[in-house]
């Protein structure tokens, strides 16, 4: 699905300003529709690198994900943080979500945007289920040391991303510790995202 022209223009103007019109480059759109794993991490990392090689002005990550693997999410976050090209995260189309790992990725982006009718959050680390063992629920406050370590690490990680990008760090930590979620209009009002 194509990004609405109004949003594309707003994102471009946020980063390029007047210099954009002197030497404009392409806007690269990379889409993820599904779980975050090694394949999606490879796709996004390579796409961000190629955008820089091609002289892109902006990379737009169009996200619709229920979350995924921690290691893959962290690879993507590192690529965004190291990117020479501004990266805008856009949760779209309407009805999409950036849950769990998607929330961290959106927080890492230079600019975060959501289409109306989308949501983000529920970023508590959970162990993935197997056919003989269902996925676990978010760890309780009285969980064992390993679960507490995972939650504390995840909370510090997303808080750091929020502080880096000037976004709502308190809500980010709640998304990890309490598995809370927000709709797009609430996320904009609470300064979790930059544009809706």
Predicted segments with their positions:
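Bacterial N-terminal signal peptides
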Residues: 8-19
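Soluble extramembrane regions of membrane proteins in the secretory/endomembrane system
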Residues: 20-196
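Bacterial N-terminal signal peptides that target proteins for export
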Residues: 1-9
């Amino acid at each position: 699905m194509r990004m609405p022209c109004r949003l594309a223009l707003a994102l471009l103007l946020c980063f390029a300003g007047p210099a954009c019109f002197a030497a404009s480059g392409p806007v690269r759109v990379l889409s993820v529709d599904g779980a975050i794993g090694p394949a999606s991490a490879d796709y996004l990392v390579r796409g961000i690198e190629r955008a820089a090689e091609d002289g892109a002005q902006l990379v737009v990550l169009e996200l619709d994900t229920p979350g995924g693997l921690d290691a893959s999410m962290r690879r993507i976050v590192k690529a965004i943080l190291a990117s020479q090209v501004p990266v805008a995260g856009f949760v779209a189309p309407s009805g999409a979500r950036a849950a769990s790992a998607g929330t961290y990725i959106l927080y890492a982006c230079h600019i975060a945007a959501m289409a109306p009718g989308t949501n983000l959050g529920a970023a508590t680390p959970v162990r993935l289920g197997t056919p003989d063992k269902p996925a676990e629920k978010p760890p309780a406050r009285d969980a064992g040391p390993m679960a507490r370590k995972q939650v504390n690490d995840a909370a510090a990680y997303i808080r750091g991303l929020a502080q880096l990008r000037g976004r709502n760090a308190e809500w980010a930590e709640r998304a990890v510790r309490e598995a809370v979620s927000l709709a797009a209009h609430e996320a904009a009002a609470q300064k979790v995202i930059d544009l809706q």
